[in-house]
């Protein structure tokens, strides 16, 4: 039986919010908040994959297992691919990528993503989404939108508003079409993870800065379904960080 592992990619030099992995949230760095949240799950192991000796030292100080990776990876998935190779995970094992900037991610959603990959044998990756109810979120590029087919396989991910109902204003869109926000959690089998790092990086991946588009561009399937529980958006900006801090201080 395949083991299931959680790997948290943690890059120090974030472009939108520098050093956010170490940002203080109610007395603890964000990476520790994420780690402590995912330890509530019952998976076989939890690893932090980072390019930073500073993050490694801090993470090990609170008991995390850490793999130090190169600092030139194009995405968190590339970083995880290096980490699982170093760790020697079996090809049939499943790895769940939990973003290092989502300290409030529900454990139920992590388990759901892993089970979805097990259930959808044609998919090489699984992920989650939730319905957008606020029109402003449709046009926020930090909220990645997704459209999917009738069999719950992703068609496209974008920072733009997709779909778009022609003939209606931007404010009217929310009442016409269904919009779904992608939740940045992925499950993959180790065999595909190792292959992912060798795949062609497409122009659309570079334009959108979305690593999952590499999977679609190269002809593979991503299974997707609505999350069991609502997931607060990740921390991309200082405003996001302040919102999360308030939630922890309640």
Curated annotation (Swiss-Prot):
Any matching Pfam family: CTP_transf_3
UniProt xrefs under CDD domains: CMP-KDO-Synthetase (cd02517)
Pathway info: Nucleotide-sugar biosynthesis; CMP-3-deoxy-D-manno-octulosonate biosynthesis; CMP-3-deoxy-D-manno-octulosonate from 3-deoxy-D-manno-octulosonate and CTP: step 1/1; Bacterial outer membrane biogenesis; lipopolysaccharide biosynthesis
Presence of the UniProt keyword Transferase in the record: yes
Subcellular compartments: Cytoplasm
Superkingdom classification of source: Bacteria
E.C. number(s) listed in UniProt: 2.7.7.38
Keywords attached to this entry: Cytoplasm, Lipopolysaccharide biosynthesis, Nucleotidyltransferase, Transferase
UniProt record similarity statement: Belongs to the KdsB family.
Role description: Activates KDO (a required 8-carbon sugar) for incorporation into bacterial lipopolysaccharide in Gram-negative bacteria.
Name of the molecule in the record: 3-deoxy-manno-octulosonate cytidylyltransferase
